[in-house]
Amino acid sequence: MSVVSLLGVKVLNNPAPFTSSYQFEITFECLEQLQKDLEWKLTYVGSATSSEYDQELDSLLVGPIPVGVNKFIFEADPPDLRRIPTSEILGVTVILLTCSYDGREFVRVGYYVNNEYDSEELTADPPAKPIIERIRRNILAEKPRVTRFAIKWDTEESAPAEYPPDQPEADGLDDDGAAYGQEEAELEAALLKELQEAEKNESTKGEDHDMEGADNGEEDISDAESEDIEDESDDDEDEVDEEEGNDADEDVEMGDDSEPKDDNANPAAHHSQQEVMVH
């Protein structure tokens, strides 16, 4: 269980000029007294093709952290244009808001950012050299990608398990991999049978409209097979995600839920919101 839970992140100045600072109102809850500060960072992804253009816009130590719900403002400088390829200034990129405790990252929030000109004329016919003062950024604040990691806090008991617990009863269960392979074989056999029947009808009747009907049947079967396989693949992916719980406990999209709940924000309901010291 995480000692610190991120309740919400609100982008304060959005949209804004490209050269404006980034401002976030961050709300989180602390369940225990912490011995050290939290470190927040904002990173700008300068290029989708190479991480060498990533730049840390700012970092902030927050503490001491009182138990309860806390809120603070995180402000970061805009990216250094000299470290961004000219061809990558316009378009869609990503910013990453992360928080670490004692050097161990436990939460990451990613936002898409669209950088575009403030007029349709410049957008339709952009100049060879970008006009920075005419570029505006728009953060897709409604759909952040939030990833949480299990880490060790102040005690050894809080450290995540290095290995999954023993489950001897699982040895007697059916092998999902074998069952999946059997279903694949059954689907292929059914498809082959239908194709053979369609070819047989084609050779006996030889009429164009019968041929069209057989083709449609084949397409329907292929579609059904594709959908089943996709569903099964999704199930497998869900199982893989669960096995990777030690590395990333949760990877969800925070839409409307990214805003802190009323009962958390209400001082009379649970904990009083406290302004924490940043330095």
Swiss-Prot record:
Q: GO cellular component terms?
A: chromatin; chromosome, telomeric region; cytosol; H3 histone acetyltransferase complex; nucleus
Q: What is its main location?
A: nucleus
Give the residue ranges for region: Disordered.
151-279
Q: Name one GO molecular function term.
A: histone binding
Q: What are the entry keywords?
A: Chaperone, Chromatin regulator, Coiled coil, Nucleus, Transcription, Transcription regulation
Q: Which SUPFAM superfamilies match?
A: ASF1-like
What GO biological process, any one, is recorded here? Answer: silent mating-type cassette heterochromatin formation
Q: Which residues are in coiled coils?
A: 182-246
Instruction: Give the Basic and acidic residues compositional bias ranges.
Output: 194-212
State a single Pfam family of this protein.
ASF1_hist_chap
Keyword Heme among UniProt keywords: no
Cell location:
Nucleus
Top-level taxonomic group: Eukaryota
Stretches of Acidic residues bias are at: 168-187, 213-260
Give the record's family classification: Belongs to the ASF1 family.
Q: How does it assemble?
A: Interacts with histone H3 and histone H4.
Relate the protein's function as given in its record: Histone chaperone that facilitates histone deposition and histone exchange and removal during nucleosome assembly and disassembly.
Any idea what this protein is called?
Answer: Histone chaperone asf1
